[in-house]
Amino acid sequence: MTINYQFGDVDAHGAMIRALAGLLEAEHQAIISDVLTASDFWGGAGSAACQGFITQLGRNFQVIYEQANAHGQKVQAAGNNMAQTDSAVGSSWA
C-alpha cells in the first residue's frame, strides 16, 4: 500500500497565508486614506483623536500581520518537518 502525501500543498498553504499577511499593508493604507477623507468626524486630520485612531489602527494591523506571518511560517515548517520525517521513515523501510 502506498500513501501519497502532498507536502508541497502544505508549504503552498503556508506561503499563501504569508502572502495574504503582506497584502494587509495595502488594505491598511486604503483604510487610512478613508479615515483621512472623513477626518472631520474626529476634528480634522491633525487632531489628537484622528491621529490616535490612526495610530491604534496601525498597531492592530501590525499585530494581525505578525500573527498571520508567524502562522504561515509555522505551517511551512510543519510541512517541511513532516516531509523530512516521511522521507527518513520511508528510506529506513527500503
From Swiss-Prot:
It is found in: Secreted. Its main location: secreted. Signal peptide: none annotated. Forms a tight 1:1 complex with EsxW. This is ESAT-6-like protein EsxV. It comes from the Bacteria. Belongs to the WXG100 family. ESAT-6 subfamily. Pfam families: WXG100. InterPro entries: ESAT-6-like_Myco, ESAT-6-like_sf, T7SS_ESAT-6-like. It comes from Mycobacterium tuberculosis (strain CDC 1551 / Oshkosh). GO terms for cellular component: extracellular region. Keywords: Secreted.
